[in-house]
Structure formats: structure tokens, C-alpha cells
């Protein structure tokens, strides 16, 4: 989360970054991956707030086996490393972002497993079956929108959040006649 009263430029809603010279599924899931997605939430996603606020979520692929047996000390160090590496990557997009951060935390497969009891800390569920149906609803029934984990090219809790933000913006534009 960013500090009250600060702002950032509009750099897009979803930003995919990687230092990898080429696509590699091994690199994407490596414990030290440089690949991440930033989801940027702007004040216009919550227009009724008295104080405009910004929030940024960094998403990184992870394997349960890399996290499950870490000691508490190593686990804490690895989470701190993820946070720092994410801020460094974000600074390439928003150079002064570090000074604007108010709250920073990391969730891992262990976090997901602890709170959801999903096997091996899995955060994703279904695949893309619902994307076309979901995105075409307003074409068939103006004003009818769907948000959920099957409505975007990612699923589970992260897909639900991201698709919810995208859908909320579409609804806002519909209601405002834009």
C-alpha cells in the first residue's frame, strides 16, 4: 500500500516484467525468479473514497516445495527478499516508488495454505473456460456484468481480484455513459 496523499503516474493496470532473456517456465517458477506481474489499483477504482489511495500488488509464481520446509528464520528472510526484489523491479517503472510505500508484505504458498487450506498452497483454480462467456455478457444484456475467477487469463483469488477491478471499471464507464 502507498502512503496517504501520494500519487503515481498511470503506468497501466497490469504490468508484466522479467529480467529473463527468453521465456522459460523453469525461470518463471524458480525460487529466485525475476518474473513478476504488478497489478496497479488507482483511486478511480474506488471513486467514493474521501481520500484517493493507490495500491500495487506484485504477483510471483512459486513452488510449494521451495517454501514448505524453510525454517522460520529462512522463511522470513526469503519473504523480505521477495519484497525488496519487487520494489527494485517496480522502481524501474516508477523511480520514486520506494519513498511512497507505506505498507509492504509478502504472501507465499505457505500463507495461502495456512489461510485457505488449499493443497500445497495452490492459489489458482480453474482455467479460462468462462472468459468468452463472461466478457460477452454486456453485449447480450446491457448492464449485466460478471466478475469472478474464470473471467480472466488467471484464476483463483488473484484472478478474481484483478477481474473484479477490470469489471468495476467497465461498470463505472457504463453507469457514467462513457
Where are these regions (language model features)?
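Extended, polar/charged low-complexity intrinsically disordered and coiled-coil segments in eukaryotic
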Residues: 55-58
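Short connector loops/turns at beta-strand edges and beta->alpha or beta->beta junctions
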Residues: 61-65
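Glycine- and acidic
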Residues: 66-74, 146-151
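Flavin-binding catalytic cores
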Residues: 5-6, 33, 51, 74-110
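Short glycine/proline-enriched loop/turn "hinge" motifs that connect secondary-structure elements
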Residues: 46-53, 134-140
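A conserved FAD-binding loop/helix module that cradles the flavin
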Residues: 149-175
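A glycine-rich dinucleotide-binding beta-alpha-beta segment and adjacent secondary-structure elements
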Residues: 92-154
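Mid-domain catalytic core of redox enzymes
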Residues: 1-50
Amino acid at each position: 500500500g502507498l502512503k496517504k496523499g501520494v500519487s503515481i503516474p498511470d503506468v497501466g493496470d497490469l504490468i508484466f516484467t522479467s529480467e529473463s532473456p527468453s521465456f522459460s517456465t523453469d525461470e518463471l517458477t524458480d525460487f529466485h525468479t525475476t518474473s513478476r506481474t504488478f497489478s496497479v489499483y488507482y483511486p478511480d477504482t474506488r471513486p467514493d473514497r474521501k481520500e484517493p489511495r493507490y495500491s500495487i500488488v506484485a504477483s510471483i509464481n512459486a513452488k510449494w516445495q521451495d517454501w514448505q520446509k524453510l525454517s522460520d528464520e529462512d522463511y522470513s528472510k526469503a519473504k523480505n527478499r521477495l519484497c525488496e526484489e519487487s520494489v527494485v523491479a517496480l522502481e524501474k517503472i516508477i523511480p520514486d516508488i520506494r519513498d511512497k510505500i507505506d505498507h509492504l508484505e509478502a504472501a507465499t504458498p505457505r500463507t495461502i495454505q495456512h489461510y485457505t487450506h488449499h493443497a500445497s498452497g495452490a492459489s489458482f483454480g480453474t482455467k479460462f473456460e468462462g472468459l468468452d462467456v463472461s466478457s460477452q455478457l454486456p453485449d447480450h444484456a446491457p448492464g449485466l456484468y460478471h466478475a469472478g475467477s474464470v473471467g480472466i487469463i488467471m484464476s483463483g483469488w488473484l484472478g478474481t481480484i484483478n477481474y473484479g477491478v477490470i469489471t468495476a471499471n467497465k461498470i463505472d464507464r457504463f453507469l457514467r455513459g462513457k
